[in-house]
Amino acid sequence: MTRQQFLRLLTSGSVSAIAGPFAYPQRAAASDRGSHGAPTNDQPLPTNDQRPTTDDQRPAGFPAGVTKAVTAFIQHSRLDDIPDKALVEAKRCLIDGFGVVLAGATVHGSAIVREYVKTFDVATRGASILGPERLSANAGHAALANAASGHAMDYDDTQLSSTPDRVFGLLTHPTVPVLAASLAIGERLGVSGRKFLEAFLTGFEVECKIAEAIKPDHYLRGFHSTGTMGTFGGAASAAKLLALTPTAIPHALGIAASMSSGIRVNFGSMTKPLHAGRAAENGITAAELASRGFTAGDDALDGEWGFFQVLGGGVDLPRIMTTLGRPYSIVDPGVSFKPYPCGSLGHPTMDAMLKLVTDHDVKPDQVAHVAVRAGSNILNPLRYKTAKTELEAKFCLPFMMSSILLRRRAGIREFTDEFVASAPVQAMMANVETVFDKDIEARGFDKMRSVVVVQLKDGRTLTQPSDERYRGGPENPFTRADLHAKFTDCASLVLSADRIKRALDAIESVEKLANIRELVSALTA
């Protein structure tokens, strides 16, 4: 096209002719489109002349009502109607969640967030920030700080997928954003333990079902689902505690949809846990604004411009429309609890190395070379070939292997900047290689599969495949004793032994508390 032709087209108003096949479809006016609906994953967006003019003319693939279904669930959920098994599992998640919040509050990134929160001089400081010092803030900032702490060590629980077609069979870290939002609003209002538990389970279920329903492309595009899905969980739990009306709840969801974010490029930095913090804070902001009459689209999860389509390329309706609370995701398929404070994709490999080292009594000075063979579902997210900081170490297989070889453990006292940067660790990491294995890749992404191969200086080669029934997962779950031990280890960085016992007692009897502030008191240093 010549410059003269371009100018003639521009002055004639035919801009779409210039863009040709690369033009973005223009949004139809409200009167020219249906009020809900997203295309299926395989269906392209309709052109302007194909778009429906009324709901009755909506084409197949543009279903209505996901936002309405979520709204109805939030409005009508009641603790009395929730199965006992869900209540038991909720308490297990709370034990794990509060433990990792307390431990995570001791790391440098969490301290920076608290210093940021301190700069706000607000009249109402009705919510506590857990950690090594007594602090309070408004609900949003308290939730920001607590949730950022809860994800700071990458030690928080993981939602399991109900089907093996989702990448890794894992979806998001569900507890921390919802816990932080529920605690902040609950403490400010002085609600009972039952109301707190009701809100926690409501937000947890909304977050998990949205994570189930969105297409896997959401995560593959680079979104961090803890930040994106957690925003809806925080909004749902806050909406429940604030008793939002059926009119206000969709607006809260719409605001949350526009505030939902988090990208995977920030894995291995302080910003990854900030995603969880912002999810909790933004969820509260969405509910608080909606409670005051602030508006948003009332179909934000639906439609060609709705959350599912824009951020994930579509929605699997059966995973959400008829499954909210049927069963509760916290029960089936459940969650996995982490035995190590790092990316869960490395845990089966770490257990394999631990078994190899203990079975053969391998000493660090015997090791000549280590190879970890795995598929891209493990090697791509655990992207660091070597680590200089504890944040990088959480996504670095060579560090994970080195820690177990050197200390036969990899806990919160190993994931420190000092240990990661130490000469023995750096030297051992130089001997660890990650290898893409096409045979493992061909078996699919539904499991976390790997093989550890250790060559010793005496010429022996030791091999250990990972166990797909990984510790903390559905086939090898944490016991009550395991959870108590993890909580004690985490909380001991902040609380005395007496307070740790008091906190555990309060969590396990949370539904009996007249005021959730009793639990906050038990968790406060």
Regions found by a protein language model. Give the residues of each.
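Twin-arginine (Tat) signal peptide motif
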Residues: 1-7
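N-terminal core-entry segment
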Residues: 9-27, 31, 55-333, 378, ...
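Short, well-ordered loop/turn and helix-capping segments at boundaries between secondary-structure elements
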Residues: 12, 276, 285-296, 313, ...
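Intrinsic disorder/low-complexity segments
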Residues: 29-57
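Flexible, glycine/charged-enriched surface loops at secondary-structure junctions
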Residues: 84-85, 108-110, 294-302, 359-370, ...
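Membrane-embedded hairpin module used as a gating/binding unit in multi-pass transport
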Residues: 314-358
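Intrinsically disordered, low-complexity Ser/Thr/Pro/Gly-rich interaction regions
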Residues: 343-497
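A short, charged
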Residues: 485-517
